[in-house]
Regions:
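Short, solvent-exposed secondary-structure junction/capping segments
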Residues: 11-12, 24-40
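Short helix-adjacent coil turns
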Residues: 17-21
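A beta-strand edge to alpha-helix "cap/lid" segment located at domain peripheries
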Residues: 2-6, 15-16, 33, 47, ...
Length: 135
């Protein structure tokens, strides 16, 4: 598969909330880096991470408008688009909890799998909503 095909499949699995599909596309030493720089290492840790995130944001999706690939010794893709969803707590949608924001993602592809997935987005509005919104 080309790096574009791998990242396209990864985004498709994210939008389908297909945790098994996501983990099948990750290297065993996969690294996820969030917008605050927090690193989660390992496929199994990210299986738990995506499962938890999809329970908190059950309508999360990425709409990618552009992607670029550079192959300078390793295949790196940059994806640009919009992330959207709504915050749920205890399986209840929080009032006024829908959000949409620009997002960029850097992906490192190795052996037809995602070795690293780094998200660049301003998530402070979502974090603030989580701190202050009550059901």
């Amino acid at each position: 598969m080309t790096p574009q095909e791998v990242t396209r499949q990864f985004v498709t699995a994210i939008n389908a909330h297909d945790v098994e599909g996501l983990t099948s596309l990750m290297t065993s030493d996969h690294r996820f880096i969030d917008s605050l720089g927090t690193v989660v290492e390992g496929r199994e840790a990210m299986r738990e991470g995506w499962t938890f995130y999809f329970s908190m944001v059950p309508d999360y999706r990425l709409d990618i408008s552009r992607s670029f690939v550079a192959e300078n010794g390793k295949a790196e893709a940059m994806l640009v688009g919009v992330a959207s969803g709504s915050y749920w707590s205890n399986e209840i949608k929080r009032p006024d909890s829908s959000w949409s924001m620009p997002v960029a993602v850097r992906a490192v592809i190795r052996d037809d799998q995602v070795a690293e997935w780094q998200v660049y987005a301003d998530n402070e509005p979502i974090r603030e909503q989580m701190r202050t919104t009550s059901v």
